[in-house]
Amino acid sequence: MAKELVMYSRTSGCPYVTISKKVLDEYNIPYREIYIDRDGEARERLLDWVGFLSVPTLVVAEAGELIPYEEPEPLERGLSPRGIDRGSMLTEPNASQLKQWLSHHAFITVEGV
């Protein structure tokens, strides 16, 4: 299965989106960016998955798809999704969390991860 990275984002500025884009650009990782403030279906998907409109939410999808290739691990009700590795999904990560998640999914190789 060919994997693709999809980032759910919004058009207005967000520090976590900036961090994620910086890491993805640093490693030359291609990704598709879906803007939840322009796409109502994407907005609803994000609410279903995360419980919040938290961006960025990154998913590993099959090539050409917009949804995770496998069901993300569930979140405890009311728990913030920030930085929690849910397998095929990661929301609002810091740079270190994102690098570890990307390494786990073989998008990059990071020493010590």
Task: Name each region found by the language model.
Residues 1-32:
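Local sequence-structure signature of Cys/Sec-based thiol-disulfide redox active-site neighborhoods
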Residues 8, 34, 46, 86:
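Conserved short-loop catalytic and cofactor-binding motifs
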Residues 11, 37, 93:
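Conserved residues at beta->alpha junctions
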Residues 62-112:
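Non-catalytic, surface beta->alpha helical segment in thiol-disulfide oxidoreductase systems
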